[in-house]
Amino acid sequence: MAVGQASDDGDGGGTLSRRSVLVLAALTGAGLLAGCERGAMALLASRGDIASAWAAQLPRPWSLKLLEDPQQVLAQRAEAQLLQLSDGWASSLDPAALAPIGSSALLARLDPAAHAPGRLFASEGPVRAWPWSVSPWVLVLRSRFDLLRHRAEGWNLLLDPSLAGKLVLPSSPRVSMALMGEDPGRLAQLRRAAIACDEPNALNLLLTARAEAAVLPRQRVVPLLRRDPRIAVLLPDDGAPLSWNLLLRGGKPWPEPPLDWLAAVLEPPLLLQVLRAGWVPPLPHGLLEQVATGLPQPLARLLVPPEQV
């Protein structure tokens, strides 16, 4: 038998037994698997806070890990290379601890309004976040079609006496202040009317009839509109505060997610898929209007309303 050929009995100074070959193969395989694990990179997001069609295209070695809420994403951020957070939750992070993301060419494809959240609202500096989706806050009503007849009142409907104790407000006081302006009396009245300031649980409170109205980012409601005729959405004509979905990198020198994947959400066919699910990338309004022609008209008008709204 030639040197290097496996023998059955393990004898022979320069030969490898079949058992040795199997052990060596197992050890080599374990090493390869460990190497794969070390090369894996995670994107953390809370459930319902990322477009599933886009996340499904995340290339290897990246993988998506879904958590229950944004607080868990923040708590586990040291374990991940990429985070998905709204601008409200991202504001708790130190921008200096975040690595730049994307490119100037990629950011230039977005509407200019997206540049500020891309810098985490700093007046200048590098792009610290990829603002891949934007959603206005909307008024969501359950079985209150009587209030829809007064939609011209806009956000003043929140102060309707019939909603006292039946209203869910955003967790962020900043949003409530934006809705009521600078009037402290109106803001105090709004807070007294709220059953909770907890938008993560607002839909559950609506569906279980513990609330009749809630202020939520538009995207959270779009899937529900298709299956629950009791739910109606009001986007006041005088506008609304915006909620931005952001991707952020940790401060360690992790590899950046592929630019092709970041850009995919801005282009057909994926762009139309995410629009159907209620996600609206912050592209120029004319381009969004053109793509939205592939949607049912009521959904298109909700997602891409006239530019002055």
Task: Tell where the protein language model's regions lie, with residue ranges.
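Short beta-strand->loop
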Residues: I101-L110, A129, R226-P241, G250-G251
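N-terminal segment of the mature folded domain
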Residues: E37-A152, L159
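Non-transmembrane alpha-helical segments in soluble domains
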Residues: L22, N156-L159, L203, L207, ...
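A bilobed periplasmic-binding-protein/Venus flytrap-type ligand-binding module shared by bacterial periplasmic
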Residues: V138-D146, L242-P258, Q273-V274
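N-terminal secretory signal peptides and thylakoid transit peptides that target proteins
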Residues: G4-G29
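Extracellular/periplasmic juxtamembrane helices and adjacent flexible linkers that interface
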Residues: E256, D260, A264-V309
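Ligand-binding pocket segment of bilobal, Venus flytrap-like solute-binding proteins
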Residues: Q76, D87-L93, V168-G239
